[in-house]
Amino acid sequence: MNGEARSRVVDQEAGSTPSTLRDEDHPSRQRLFGCLPYDIDLNPLRIVMAELVGTFILMFSVCGVISSTQLSGGHVGLLEYAVTAGLSVVVVVYSIGHISGAHLNPSITIAFAVFGGFPWSQVPLYITAQTLGATAATLVGVSVYGVNADIMATKPALSCVSAFFVELIATSIVVFLASALHCGPHQNLGNLTGFVIGTVISLGVLITGPISGGSMNPARSLGPAVVAWDFEDLWIYMTAPVIGAIIGVLTYRSISLKTRPCPSPVSPSVSSLLR
């Protein structure tokens, strides 16, 4: 069997359409610039960009609903905030879920690295992309709507202790469901996955909004804090979601008797997307 035939067999076994592209012709291995003497693998780059763009969409949507309400002279309604966060997650999951997994949240990335089989080597890349996306979205939101960045920030409405524990508990609920979708018998929900994730995000915002501002995401809180240069009580939103996410994964693995990490989904290559 020649090389072309073997390539067709491998493609058919993988469920993709047959392709006669050589390795050096695959878009994921092309040279970005002709002056470079080596090929660059585009897969890590596009995964990082997917997380950055996805987090940008999520954060800009949040900035939009907060700013629009502020400009209209009203107060941000909890239901509007929850629906906006949930719908934006639905959009992003369907847009980039097949590329990066659509974590959009450093706490989810860390929790899946600890217990879910996600490679630690990619954790810094994901967190950097998520933080940059949230910060860029806040900057754009401030410029577009002409508001102060501090209205995007998350602050405890009651005590720091209450905010800490409500963020921890809500994040554990969100990640508990995410673990079930990733590892459980319902991992093949197909087109319903995005709506399920978006629904639980909305639930989390409804639970946490009156107490902590509804973050459950270190990047979502860090972006506005950096732009406003106000880091008061930021430690709550940096630590509680991470601890809660780890508890969520650990709880699911304990009650489902999972003894091994769930396999991390393999992101498709650029070449397979373009065939």
From Swiss-Prot:
Annotated signal sequence range: none
Segments for region (Disordered): 1-26
Modified residue annotations for Phosphoserine: 272
Pfam families xref list: MIP
Composition bias, Basic and acidic residues: 1-11
Tissue: Expressed in floral buds.
Any single Gene Ontology cellular-component annotation: membrane
Keyword annotations of the record: Membrane, Phosphoprotein, Repeat, Transmembrane, Transmembrane helix, Transport
SUPFAM superfamilies documented for this protein: Aquaporin-like
UniProt subcellular location: Membrane
Membrane protein topology class: Multi-pass membrane protein
Short sequence motif NPA 1: positions: 105-107
Database matches in PANTHER family: AQUAPORIN NIP2-1 (PTHR45724), AQUAPORIN NIP7-1-RELATED (PTHR45724:SF26)
Known role: Aquaporins facilitate the transport of water and small neutral solutes across cell membranes.
Comment field on protein domains: Aquaporins contain two tandem repeats each containing three membrane-spanning domains and a pore-forming loop with the signature motif Asn-Pro-Ala/Ser (NPA).
Family: Belongs to the MIP/aquaporin (TC 1.A.8) family. NIP (TC 1.A.8.12) subfamily.
Protein name: Probable aquaporin NIP7-1
Organism: Arabidopsis thaliana (Mouse-ear cress)
